[in-house]
């Protein structure tokens, strides 16, 4: 009988809303595309999630890809608390599974700044889990 459930976070328990955040910050058209390619679509994004780079280091790497948008790239990091949105079902579902006796674990790729910015809000379901392993840990 299955008694343990292991969840990823992104696009399972939270919506990774980088497109909406970028639009909210006023990035449109070519600017949107250049900033996206310099950040979330850049291989350095995964290295940052792994915890191998500081925020300052990754911003510098991203800015190398789009130096004219360094200010905007910095602005993204001032809005890390808005880059994901908790799915409505995430909290109730994790509580229900826990009440039914399932042991819930999290295994996910997350950067430390995004984790810390969302811990009390969009990652509130973590209170229901038995353990977690994030890529930055």
Task: For the regions a language model picked out, list residue spans one by one.
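Residues at the starts of beta-strands that form the adenosine-phosphate
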Residues: 103
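Short beta-strand/turn micro-motifs composed of small residues
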Residues: 108
